Amino acid sequence: MGCFFSKKSRRKSPKKDAALPTGDESATGNDLAETNNTALGSNSNQEAPKQYSWDKREKVDPKDFMLTGLKNETVGRLPGKLNGQQFVIQDCENCNIFVLDHSATITIDDCVNCRIVLGPVKGSVFFRDCKDIKCVVACQQFRTRDCKKMDVFLCCATQPIIESSTGMKFGCFQYYYPELAFHFKDAGLSIFNNNWSNIHDFTPVSGETNWSLLPEDAVVLDHVPLPDPESEFKSVRIATEAGRSIVPLTKGSRRTESEESCLFVFFAGDYTTANARKLIDEATAKGFVLIQTKEVSMRPEDVSRVFQNNAESLTEWITKGPVVALELNGDGVVEACRSFANEVFNGTQLFVSESKNTSSRDVDNFFNFADMQMGL
């Protein structure tokens, strides 16, 4: 079916202060000084009261984690300002909003005509009662309710959900700033798990289409501009080109131009992510298209089901961590990927489809397993 390549204390009671003489009127000044020094010395040896985590916790000002009632402004948060906290955006109009940090959850309510960039969100991003929004979002869960006309460049680990929303358009996340890769890691998100085009409409209307995909050549800057040069974000090096994006640009559920696809799997190692990015660069430079990617953990029984005849040789490789899989598409892609495996990744632990006769089955076996594993 395919081929693979490998290389080998309890708290102490505080001491009591030494008692100063009170009844001995003959005590000299030197005696008193010495006694005082002794007392001070005893105090200095006392053990400090035990501190608990809630004693050390910094006080949080809720206003630092909200943007409310703003109009015609460029606002947001710089890297390092949220550090995994929750964030709220509400009642903003005609604003450019840049939240360039990782967070726990973000809710956006009653905003109109805003351009928004949200750094990686560990939990959910929830838009409610918003209109005319253009945004770049990376999150675990994405949901909208009662929204109209949104253009979303999305990276979402689970299936995005829209509810009572119309005029929704989606594209693949394309964004870069220097801290973004670290923010993905801090938020527990994989750049390879992106279901941006797999939208679930919770309230479909017969005969109407509430959502669609943005044109394949859609450019982020045409929807979400860079920060104002006079704003606090002017020092952040932002890029929106697909080749610079932290998240790989995938075709998603759009129709493929070729019937030939290839499964390419990297097993866990020190350079798995770098190798996957290199393969994408090599393949796209030759005109092939990246359809989808996944990063998942596998068990021995999963290997048997997915890789079938090659399972025995691959089982030991899955113990080192998750695998990263890519589907590449285009006429001649299988032969090209096998050449990449031999010439570029020789000695790397990987699996690549053996022939175009079995490659479609390889792709279906792996990504059906991955979707089940992730509950999609």
UniProtKB/Swiss-Prot annotation:
GO terms for molecular function: GTP binding; GTPase activator activity. Myristoylated on Gly-2; which may be required for membrane targeting. Palmitoylated on Cys-3; which may be required for plasma membrane targeting. Residues 25-48 have a biased composition (Polar residues). Its main location: membrane. GO terms for cellular component: cilium; periciliary membrane compartment. Gene3D superfamilies: 2.160.20.70, Nucleoside diphosphate kinase-like domain. This is Protein XRP2. It comes from Danio rerio (Zebrafish).
